[in-house]
Curated annotation (Swiss-Prot):
Pfam families: CobS. Joins adenosylcobinamide-GDP and alpha-ribazole to generate adenosylcobalamin (Ado-cobalamin). Also synthesizes adenosylcobalamin 5'-phosphate from adenosylcobinamide-GDP and alpha-ribazole 5'-phosphate. Keywords: Cell inner membrane, Cell membrane, Cobalamin biosynthesis, Magnesium, Membrane, Transferase, Transmembrane, Transmembrane helix. The chain crosses the membrane at residues 34-54, 59-79, 113-133, 138-158, 194-214. One of its GO terms (molecular function) is adenosylcobinamide-GDP ribazoletransferase activity. GO terms for cellular component: plasma membrane. InterPro entries: CobS. GO terms for biological process: cobalamin biosynthetic process. Its EC number is 2.7.8.26. Its cofactor is Mg(2+). Pathway: Cofactor biosynthesis; adenosylcobalamin biosynthesis; adenosylcobalamin from cob(II)yrinate a,c-diamide: step 7/7. This is Adenosylcobinamide-GDP ribazoletransferase.
Amino acid sequence: MSKLFWAMLSFITRLPVPRRWSQGLDFEHYSRGIITFPLIGLLLGAISGLVFMVLQAWCGAPLAALFSVLVLVLMTGGFHLDGLADTCDGVFSARSRDRMLEIMRDSRLGTHGGLALIFVVLAKILVLSELALRGEPILASLAAACAISRGTAALLMYRHRYAREEGLGNVFIGKIDGRQTCVTLGLAAIFAAVLLPGMHGVAAMVVTMVAIFILGQLLKRTLGGQTGDTLGAAIELGELVFLLALL
């Protein structure tokens, strides 16, 4: 289990992980790592939240929010934001399904992708600032948001098909079963309940689950399935929806 965690941490983040810690794990077994996604999100969110807390007293909530979001982007290497941009470029191109998938593979940033990046990053900064002004616990909120967003991404993997012939998303999409999905969502729910007691966190998670489920169905209808890019988009939007639901 520890090898699986370190392998997933290395796979979906840019945090330094010694190779020997995940050595011997076959790539085809990575799908079992979905259950570690909420824990990895918890770690990323906690680090980002600590940055906010350290900087808030020095430069105020808005700049602290800016740098906490920046740290989150750096820790993931912009991996999920890239998926969000590619997804928006493809889906909003209003082309044929095959052409949409082709556009999503293009490394160049389009207008729709650029606008999506600006909106999501700016919205996160503003929501974090507002939560801080309302006296909400930012460390707990960010840790929960990152855990829940990565946990609910399982909704785009379970009983979905991969929209392409090959790619990194094929490791997870259509490869996880009902038990793994339930365990992943259950862990995310536990983190939400513990970090944000009084059902506030669980209620925000339910809102996020509904939003991500609807997103998955819309993408399935538009693209014929999911890709690694759509998983990244779901994680980014899941973080934002969860934080908005806390307001």
